[in-house]
């Protein structure tokens, strides 16, 4: 096995996807430049082209026209007659159902992926991969002995064992129940921070997007309707994600201190303090915090006789109708964006207009990781 220290990928120029594919009455058109690391989520309704986009990246749609370049390696350039078939593309592909070899145990499944790559092209450390997915204790087990979450972790590890330059995850949690999703999510979070290759993650679950994705691509009927940082797109009132009961903002907060007596942790984002339930996190560590729009209320004056701990100075950016009698308010707080879903009557009573200074009262937060 390769036990030498893991090396960074040979090129960090990122991923270029400029392609078009016509299928009867459906047309996929994508023009994207993506970062060379981190998780990019493809999000959209069924039939929007998410899985088709992955298939184009993998070389499974030879009819697609355009360019695919991954970390400086041109996989497809139709104008130049370049098209590498799937077996010549250094990628890992994980589907909804973990496709493990039932006649091989976990270690043998991983060795299959490991041996696919010539020794000279291996940069993925074997032990690092086991640690990343937390599967060292599973090596002698057979696929039928694994839970759904364990099977997916092994499938991802097998894909990584081949030292891919790109990892494609096609709704890897769609077939899992809630407990198994909770089991695998912390390991998927590790991919976000510890892999030096781009990860393209297809999902239709907004909670997965909020927790995992650095960048977000919205697809509708084969077209890219928006692309950018996840935190930004989740709070744009011109996009559907910023509306409805599931709307909310994602903040990246640094741990400042812990209050052991009251079981609280003080965090800070953009110079703004945010108190959260006690976290097992080191001072200086960054936490991903989600504030649901339904958990934010607004006042014109700072309240002192309240049980709410987080009362943040804010200014109104924009307002948008959000269902019968409801208004979604976009707020700026220390340069970051928040959402508050309030009644239309409250918005009228407070006289909310863009630029108005208010206080956002945060009733609760969710620590995503």
Swiss-Prot record:
User: Known SMART domains for this protein?
Assistant: AAA
Main enzyme class: translocase
Q: What does this protein do?
A: Part of the ABC transporter complex ModABC involved in molybdenum import. Responsible for energy coupling to the transport system.
Q: Is ATP-binding set as a keyword in this record?
A: yes
For this protein's source organism, the top of the classification is: Bacteria, Pseudomonadati, Pseudomonadota, Betaproteobacteria, Burkholderiales
Pinpoint the Mop domain residues.
Answer: 305-369
Q: Matching InterPro entries, A to Z? A: AAA+_ATPase (IPR003593), ABC_transporter-like_ATP-bd (IPR003439), ABC_transporter-like_CS (IPR017871), Mo/tungstate-bd_C_term_dom (IPR008995), ModC_ABC_ATP-bd (IPR011868), Molybdenum_import_ModC (IPR050334), Mop_domain (IPR004606), P-loop_NTPase (IPR027417)
Q: Which UniProt keywords apply?
A: ATP-binding, Cell inner membrane, Cell membrane, Membrane, Molybdenum, Nucleotide-binding, Translocase, Transport
Positions contributing to ATP binding: 44-51
Q: Name one GO molecular function term.
A: ATP hydrolysis activity
What is the protein named?
A: Molybdenum import ATP-binding protein ModC
Gene3D superfamilies recorded for this chain? 2.40.50.100, P-loop containing nucleotide triphosphate hydrolases
Q: Which family does it belong to?
A: Belongs to the ABC transporter superfamily. Molybdate importer (TC 3.A.1.8) family.
What's the catalysed reaction?
A: molybdate(out) + ATP + H2O = molybdate(in) + ADP + phosphate + H(+)
This enzyme's EC code(s): 7.3.2.5
GO cellular component terms, semicolon-separated? plasma membrane
In which organism is this protein found?
Albidiferax ferrireducens (strain ATCC BAA-621 / DSM 15236 / T118)
Which cellular compartments is it found in? Cell inner membrane
Self-association state and partner proteins as the record states: The complex is composed of two ATP-binding proteins (ModC), two transmembrane proteins (ModB) and a solute-binding protein (ModA).
> What is the membrane topology here?
Peripheral membrane protein
ABC transporter domain sequence ranges:
3-246
